[in-house]
């Protein structure tokens, strides 16, 4: 996968600039992805019970995934805290996202609709040529790059992204127990996207107060 540039990601998000519930849902999903590095199905599967305070820090608690390492706690970035709290206040059958609540598949995936919408928006914003490797998972790739550039220890990046790191189970268990939500929150706060924050008027008071002009 290839990470989006800030400009490219803003162009994709601006495809969802209308005021419809569907556009708002996609913007919210994408912002959570950009400020956490979570997988698209992890985000779509979030319920109100997965957003909780742990040791005084508002976090996403991811309880299931492909591997044992995927189960983890990811602090909520201050810039999307109002957005996340508003989603938690108005759930859809317990889920943060409406289209996840109405998607039931044998494989348990809740993100089918969101994946399709994101792919269409990317093609509309950036075209098809040369963008094949830029998908929703690229947000996760970008988060890993940003954390690495900020010289965050590899085992901490692995904890935040739910990667398996280290040669032994003992190493991972120790790391998980040693990293407090307060420590992890400091790393999450390093994730910043100046062009996107300016283009979408994202701030700590209001995350979806968009400018009317693209």
Regions picked out by a protein language model, each given a short descriptive name:
Residues 1-40, 140:
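Basic, Lys/Arg- and aromatic-enriched nucleic-acid-binding interface segment
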Residues 3, 66-68, 103, 161-197:
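Catalytic-site neighborhood detector that most strongly recognizes the C-terminal catalytic loop/helix
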Residues 8, 36, 45-85:
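Conserved tyrosine-mediated DNA breakage-rejoining catalytic core shared by Y-recombinases
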Residues 9, 77-131, 213-214:
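Active-site/catalytic core of tyrosine-dependent DNA strand-transfer enzymes
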Residues 16-23, 36, 74, 90-95, ...:
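Short, basic (Lys/Arg/His-rich) helix/loop patches that form interaction surfaces
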Residues 32-46, 150-153:
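A short, glycine-centered helix-capping/turn motif at helix boundaries
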Residues 51-55, 152-175, 195-208:
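Short, polar N-cap/turn motifs at the start of nucleic acid-interacting alpha helices
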Residues 91, 112-113, 154, 179-214:
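Acidic, low-complexity interaction regions
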């Amino acid at each position: 996968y290839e990470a989006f540039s800030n400009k490219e990601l803003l162009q994709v998000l601006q495809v969802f600039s209308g005021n419809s519930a569907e556009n708002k849902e996609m913007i919210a999903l994408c912002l959570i992805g950009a400020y956490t590095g979570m997988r698209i199905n992890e985000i779509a599967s979030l319920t109100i019970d997965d957003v909780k305070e742990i040791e005084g820090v508002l976090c996403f608690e991811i309880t299931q995934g492909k591997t044992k390492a995927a189960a983890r706690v990811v602090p909520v970035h201050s810039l999307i805290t109002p957005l996340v709290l508003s989603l938690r206040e108005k759930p859809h059958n317990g889920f943060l996202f409406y289209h996840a609540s109405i998607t039931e598949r044998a494989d348990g995936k809740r993100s089918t609709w969101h994946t399709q919408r994101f792919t269409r928006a990317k093609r509309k914003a950036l075209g098809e040529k040369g963008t094949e490797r830029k998908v929703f998972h690229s947000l996760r790739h970008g988060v890993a790059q940003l954390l690495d550039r900020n010289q965050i220890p590899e085992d901490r990046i692995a904890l935040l992204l739910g990667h398996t790191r280290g040669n032994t189970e003992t190493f991972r268990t120790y790391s998980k127990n040693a990293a407090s939500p307060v420590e992890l929150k400091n790393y999450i706060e390093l994730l910043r996207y100046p062009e996107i924050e300016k283009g979408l008027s994202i701030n700590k008071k209001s995350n979806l107060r968009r400018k009317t002009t693209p």
